[in-house]
């Protein structure tokens, strides 16, 4: 038995977390474990991990010395445009094109919102962000209805999204790495320990090129 409280960012809600948790619960020793789920932005999740309300968090990287961060899946950043759009014929779109069209962005408080701003500074892009959204579903919906274009990770939301074009970023490979994090010096129930170790083995199975991806990404980590 045991109880595990986890928090995770919105892009992991559609498939990643439900799928991983179900596989964990299907193991004989875990069948009586109870999960509580909570969705939010990375900083809010980290705060609840720190107070002990959550055992484990899943989100972006934060510079926190009292927490352990373990890299899990990595998603390439892409530009999405509406079906009928001047860029629609281009397979790859330069990042600078974000300067020339209205942009649908992330809420500033979210990890992805902060990361996007960092990337804009790094690559000297100055987009006109007309609206900030809490999650990828909202971004895709607004792009589909021709309110603007967007920079976002290639999540499973995009696999089933119609009415939009997905473009690689020309000449750049930028990734959003998802991390699992927990408090370093805190007692954890055996079920929580098993779940952390299970997720680490899942990462190894999912890896493919994740190791290389992490290296590309980790150069970009900044202290927000």
Regions found by a protein language model. Name each.
Residues 1-15, 19, 26, 193, ...:
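N-terminal hydrophobic or amphipathic helices and topogenic motifs
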Residues 2-64, 132-133:
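Central regulatory/effector-binding core of bacterial HTH transcription factors
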Residues 41-45, 50-53, 109-167:
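Hydrophobic hinge/microswitch elements
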Residues 65-71, 75-76, 90, 137-185:
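Beta-alpha-beta core module
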Residues 67-103:
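Flexible hinge/capping segments at coil-to-helix
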Residues 102-123, 188-196, 203-214:
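Secondary-structure junction motif
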